[in-house]
Structures are given as structure tokens and as C-alpha cells.
Regions:
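Conserved ABC ATPase "signature" region
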Residues: 18, 124, 135-153, 200-204
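The feature captures the beta-strand-to-loop junction immediately N-terminal to the Walker
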Residues: 59-61
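Helix-to-loop junction immediately C-terminal to a conserved catalytic motif
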Residues: 74
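Conserved ABC transporter NBD signature motif
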Residues: 82-89, 102, 140
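Conserved ABC ATPase signature
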Residues: 157-161, 165
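Conserved catalytic motifs of ABC-family nucleotide-binding domains
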Residues: 178
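Catalytic Walker B motif of ABC-type/P-loop ATPase nucleotide-binding domains
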Residues: 182-186
Length: 264
């Protein structure tokens, strides 16, 4: 079912905070990505895909190539070979801001909020870069605050927020441009278990609204609690792919990455 926010008809084209896409539609496909540094091939033919309405994880040991793969999707790193396709279009050579215009959102690992601005000012700072009227910005702001449970914190300075509240604000800012695909780098880093649970709940809500999400995080347990599918990358290649349950119980995944005593 397509998601349509309940807002005035005149404001909807600009005010919809989330863009619904038919579930299962392929949003992201990478074709045999290759990256070398100083004659060392750190990514060697990685192919992944993300559809609308699903959460996909990139997992693997440190130095396995998952971060480089993720950064090629984001646009921070350009592949030496292979393609990054978004909705059937090769975006391998596009800058990050051009990818954003097409509907690719990005939540960086580094703090991205303005500490001395309030929560609503942080969101407005992004909204003001969008082509819409002042009234439409107000409608969108109200909607985003409600969608990410930030309304009670709207007037709070960002530096007063907890780690989990800041992460919710960062996710909100990433949603301002109405992305169809959201890329999240270490969304669970630096936040406590309760905040992790809240962030997971929000990400599931976004998935259920039709967004596609690609996540990389060092917490395998929290990732596997959340994702619908995942890829375990080892030595620059996809070693195993499948559902969270499949990955958690795969003997090879447990031997090489998760550990034999791992459990969800």
C-alpha cells in the first residue's frame, strides 16, 4: 500500500516527508564493484541489491571491504571497475549531492547536527535548500517532527540532546529531501541500548513506508535483529548472502565472522 501523508492537497507535492515506492522495486544494484589501493584489491567483484520496502545490511570483519563497498554506493569512493545503479541509472560517476537529488539519502557516521541550533532550526536549515514556499516548509517541518517523535524536543538546543535523540534528529535531516533509498553508516554507534531499540523501531517504520535502506554497522547482533537480508563480505568478496536468520545460523558465517557461540 502506498503511503500518503494526511496533509492539505496543495502542500502535498512538497510536504510529503517520505516517498512511497512499490515494495520490491529494485532501487539499488551494484555490478561487480572493484577497488584497489596501492595494488591491493580491497573490493573484488561485489554485487548487491536493495529493493523498496526492505532493510539490507553489509556485514563482515574489519578490513574485509564492506566499508569501501558502502562508500562506493554513497559516492565517497569511485569504483575502479563495475557500476552503481540507482533505479536503472548508472550513478557511479555522480557526486554525492547529485545522487541526493535523484533520491539517495545518506546518514553519515560523523555527527552532522548543528549543536547550537534547536532541533527545528536544524531541520529548517536543510528545508531552506529545498524549493518550496514558507508555508510548505512549516507543514513539512511539523510532519517530520511528528514522524520521528521529535515534537517535544523542537525548541531544545541540539547540544542538550542525548545520543539517541541526536541520532533521531540526524535521520530526520536525512529524510528532508524525500529519499527513496537511505544509506546509513554506523547508525548504532555511540548510543545506548534503549536508543538502539528506538532507532531500530524508526528504521522499520521507514521500511514499512516503502523506503529501501542499506546499513553498515560493527554491531552484528543489532544489525541481524533489524535487517531483512544481508551480505557478509570477507576478503573483498561476498561470502554469504541471505536473510538475517540464515546468516545467523550459517556455519561458515559463524566460523569466520560471528563466532561459534553467537546467538540472537
Amino acid at each position: 500500500m502506498n503511503y500518503v501523508p494526511s496533509q492539505p492537497e496543495t502542500a502535498r507535492p512538497h510536504a510529503a516527508a517520505l516517498v512511497a515506492t512499490a515494495k520490491g522495486q529494485k532501487l539499488l544494484q551494484t555490478g561487480k564493484l572493484v577497488k584497489e589501493y596501492k595494488h591491493r584489491r580491497v573490493v573484488n567483484g561485489v554485487s548487491i541489491e536493495v529493493g523498496a520496502g526492505e532493510i539490507v545490511g553489509l556485514l563482515g570483519p574489519n578490513g574485509a571491504g564492506k566499508t569501501t563497498t558502502f562508500n562506493m554506493v554513497v559516492g565517497v569512493v569511485r569504483p575502479d571497475e563495475g557500476e552503481v545503479n540507482y533505479m536503472g541509472r548508472d550513478i557511479s560517476k555522480l557526486a554525492m549531492h547529485d545522487r541526493a537529488r535523484l533520491g539517495v539519502g545518506y546518514l553519515t557516521q560523523e555527527p552532522s547536527v548543528f549543536r547550537k541550533l534547536t532541533v527545528e532550526e536544524n531541520i529548517l536549515a536543510i528545508l531552506e535548500t529545498c524549493e518550496m514556499s514558507r508555508d510548505e516548509r512549516k507543514i513539512r517541518l511539523k510532519y517530520l517532527l511528528e514522524e520521528l517523535d521529535l515534537t517535544p524536543l523542537a525548541k531544545s538546543k541540539a547540544y542538550t540532546l542525548s545520543g539517541g535523540e541526536k541520532r533521531r534528529l540526524e535521520i530526520t535531516r536525512a529524510l528532508v529531501t524525500s529519499p527513496k533509498l537511505l544509506l546509513l553508516d554506523e547508525p548504532f554507534a555511540g548510543i545506548d541500548p534503549i536508543a538502539v531499540y528506538e532507532v531500530q523501531k524508526i528504521l522499520r517504520r521507514l521500511r514499512d513506508r516503502g523506503l529501501g535502506l542499506l546499513i553498515t554497522d560493527h554491531s552484528a547482533r543489532e544489525m541481524l535483529k533489524l535487517i531483512d537480508r544481508g551480505y557478509i563480505i570477507v576478503k573483498g568478496q561476498v561470502l554469504i548472502e541471505g536473510s538475517a536468520e540464515f546468516l545467523a545460523n550459517d556455519p561458515k558465517a559463524r566460523e569466520i565472522y560471528l563466532g561459534t557461540e553467537f546467538n540472537l
